[in-house]
Amino acid sequence: MKNKFLATLFLACSISTVSAQTPVYMDDAQPIEARVKDALSRMTLEEKVALCHAQSKFSSAGVPRLGIPELWMSDGPHGVRAEINWNDWGYANWTNDSITAFPALTCLAATWNPDMSAKYGKAIGEEARYREKDVLLGPGVNIYRTPMNGRNFEYMGEDPYLASVMCVPYIQELQKNGVAACVKHYALNNQELWRGHIDVNLSDRALHEIYLPAFKAAVEEGGAWSIMGAYNKIRGQHACHNDFTLNKILKDDWKFDGCVITDWGGAHDTYEAAVNGLDIEMGSYTNGLTSESVFTYNDYYLASPYLQMLKDGKVPMSTIDDKASRILRLIFRTAMNRQKPYGSVATEEHYAAAREIGNEGIVLLKNAPVVKKGAPLLPIDAAKYQNILVVGDNAVRLLNQGGGSSELKVKDMVSPLDGLRAAYGDKVAYAKGYAAGRPMYGRADEIPQNVVDSLRAEAVEMAKKADLVVLVGGLNKNHFQDCEGGDRLEYGLPFGQDELIEALLGVNKNLVLVLLSGNAVEMPWVSRVPAIVQGWYLGSMGGKSLADILSGAVNPSGKLPFSFPAKLTDCGAHAFDELSYPGDSIKQEYKEDILVGYRWHDTKKIPALFPFGHGLSYTTFTYGKPVASAKAMAADGTLTVTVAVKNTGSIAGKEIVQLYVGDDKCSVLRPVKELKHFAKVGLAPGEEKSVTFTLTPDDLKFYDEASAAWKYEPGKFKAYVCASSADVRGVVSFEMQ
């Protein structure tokens, strides 16, 4: 008994001694700030600097001497990219890095449903965690300024409020997995052409009202742990080390406590990188290393050159302590977070999430009868149509491939053709119809004319015998389409699709057009195509989502997150000279100012072909007369707007009720109206619900350049209850005191 007592006493003392010897920075029970301070105090200058730059293509160093691990990053934002080689862009060809491809963020934004954003963030976070990633490079929240931008498919549309609301749940749920969101590309990376050096100039109003709100929401509401700088310059200084946007706005005004990470190759100057707010430098020189004998990671701007400047007193020591503190904070939140879950990949839950997001994001643009007074063409009645012809390269193309850094290696991919065959069986035949080339980066295949002609002729012959034709076309992830590193060359459909559509209409009027893209396209045939569906890039379960909508198994409820101009010059960015878009290759001016998207269409009275917020359903909805809670709002008060919405059709559906606000008279130019609130409401047939929105004085403010502050001017305002930006269902006037 005595020996047992002594052993127990010895064990207790040993545990106590070990506990007492545990450094603060290694103690999970300690606050993160205490751990950061303790770790920093133990580090040498060289160890601090080593944190600030890459050690491989997708990792940055830890502090091995102190047991602090490295940070591992991965491209996103709609799937975890396959493993990349240590020193180059080649794939490592692992056998266990296949994942779920989730719908692109344009599709997520088109759901207008924050619950879908949360579901998305949770699922992609679990996959990133399973793949042992600490930082996921996403979501992207750059504003849709022009339909020519090759990277719009990665973003959340043209409206800053919609993008703000939709990015926050994604970030919050992602980070619950111990994986940092790296919100990108901060800021004004609104085109791919000349992205590495184009110098963007714009008003402070446009910056604060249009281009920054989603980033601000990501930081202040979403609690994002990292931000990725953009490639472009802003007012003469590169965005990855821009004093105004990083130090003044992000870190001082928004109190951001996370890390600023370059886009790969986005750093250009050691002094600016040291003092202007950059924390981690990735991918410098040729966007990485040409070979280890030519460049080493120690040659990066924030590596040996920075260390030498610190030793020479050319930059303050406070800069490295701030950077190292932020990086340590990120490491404690992610790589050293022992409470994080294990994660999972390509699960049935993730596939279900991808399918549901796709179902809610697909937008029914048009659904007309083929014959006068007949029924709309969609949904496709299996009993009515015995011979369904599916046409189009996009019906079978793997759209997870190409696109640049968002390219994904999937475990499963259901194509549109597969999805439609699962729904309609042997009634479905297929013709390619057009050729689109390979998904190469930096160049595009040239398709021989004889191939174009033969594929079109085959499709037309088969269409003559079909009861109904479903053309699955649009853009793809090839260069000069929806792809990083270059912008589109034309607003119209590529690969001869306009001619194909005309030819198919010439032999079969029962034509359903499905557009898979992340951008608007010109539609010279729009009045003659009875049914048009915007299908986005839908990911692993895309074919099932598309079949769900086309068959009527799911009622479409998505609405557009950006406007479809009838022609390119109807878009504000393209209504001026080339200095507005694409710039003169050196400089660029955002001449449309705050009038982006529907703000331009409304204010200039230029109707969009399909307006922001537009989307049809297989049922119908009626709106009652909106009622305000008061005739005036006090400076410290609120005002509610309530409207009844009823499903007057025969099937259940979801309607997205939108509330916009307009200022009747102001000393500065303001848009006719701006989106301030929305709600997605599910209604059974015949069901009616009341939807209430609460307005505050903040909803009425504009950014005043003279005072560099948000303000409103007392006076008369209008609240517009809308089914889209162009479909106003009711207006309420009120006064702001």
Model-derived segments and spans:
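Glycoside hydrolase catalytic-domain context in secreted enzymes
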Residues: 17-702, 709-726
